[in-house]
Regions:
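C-terminal hydrophobic helical "lid"/dimerization subdomain
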Residues: 165-220
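Glycine-rich cofactor phosphate-binding loops and adjacent beta1-alpha1 units
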Residues: 78, 83-150
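Mid-domain Rossmann-like dinucleotide-binding core that forms the NAD(H)/NADP(H) cofactor-binding site
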Residues: 12-90
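Glycine-rich phosphate/adenylate-binding loop and adjacent beta-alpha elements
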Residues: 1-8
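Glycine- and other small-residue-rich loops at beta-strand/loop junctions that grip anionic moieties
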Residues: 20, 44, 48, 69-70, ...
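C-terminal substrate-binding/catalytic core of Rossmann-like NAD(P)-dependent dehydrogenases/reductases
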Residues: 136-187
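Structural detector of well-ordered beta-strand residues that form the stable sheet scaffold
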Residues: 1, 44, 68, 122-124, ...
């Protein structure tokens, strides 16, 4: 059992099934704080995984922005559009952006982000590369365009909100932001925990699944 102090109540309006997105929404919220996005900016989110789509979902609410989600898997278009987001493959990219959020987890995605950043743009790196080394073209337009590469990591409260919001407050806000039925398009399943071996085999053959829900108690 976890100590009561470590628990966070799920808002009544948020179904248990959707609440599994809490950690991803908290990460997306932190990305938006690190991005320090402004009204009217041109934005790209590179990588249409759960975190990338949730970050785009939050950033697109800022007035006057033009935001496009970029992913090489054209099958992600349907999910992005279900969230009301513009989608493009790398070949269809609309051009340079003032803010680029990179969430593809690939070196190629980060290089794409750098190549599509406008003068004085910010590239927020939201991926996790572990101990892998990543080769980047920092000797080309990176200096002449005065680009800024910003690390975003959920272990600390991001940006100007650090010192003003606790981790508990950030999680509570993330949970409240899940009160949106459109987010159900990110979910697959559910499956029973006892069926997990067969479920994992099926998911391995279906790379387009974003977040599969597993129930420990089938009646939940």
């Amino acid at each position: 059992l976890a100590p009561a102090a470590m628990l966070a109540p799920v808002p009544e309006a948020v179904p248990t099934r959707r609440a599994v997105l809490a950690a991803n929404m908290e990460t997306a919220l932190n990305i938006s704080w690190d991005a320090a996005a402004l009204p009217g900016e041109r934005m790209l989110v590179v990588g249409a995984g759960v975190v990338g789509l949730l970050a785009a979902h939050l950033l697109a609410r800022i007035p006057g922005v033009s935001l496009t989600v970029i992913d090489r898997d054209g099958g992600k278009r349907k999910v992005a559009e279900a969230l009301g987001l513009a989608f493009a493959t790398p070949e269809e990219s609309p051009g340079e952006a003032d803010l680029v959020v990179h969430a593809s987890g690939t070196p190629e995605g980060l290089r794409f982000a750098l190549a599509h950043a406008a003068v004085e743009a910010r590239i927020v790196e939201a991926s996790w590369f572990g101990d892998r080394e990543v080769a980047l073209p920092l000797g080309e337009a990176f200096h002449s365009r005065r680009l800024r590469l910003v690390s975003s990591q959920v272990g600390e409260v991001g940006g100007a909100m650090r010192g003003r919001r606790s981790r508990a407050e950030r999680l509570a806000l993330a949970l409240s932001l899940l009160d949106d039925p459109r987010l159900d398009c990110l979910l697959d399943g559910p499956s029973a925990f006892d069926d997990l071996p067969a479920t994992m085999a099926r998911l391995a053959a279906s790379p387009g699944v974003l977040c599969h829900v597993v129930l420990h108690h089938p009646d939940a």
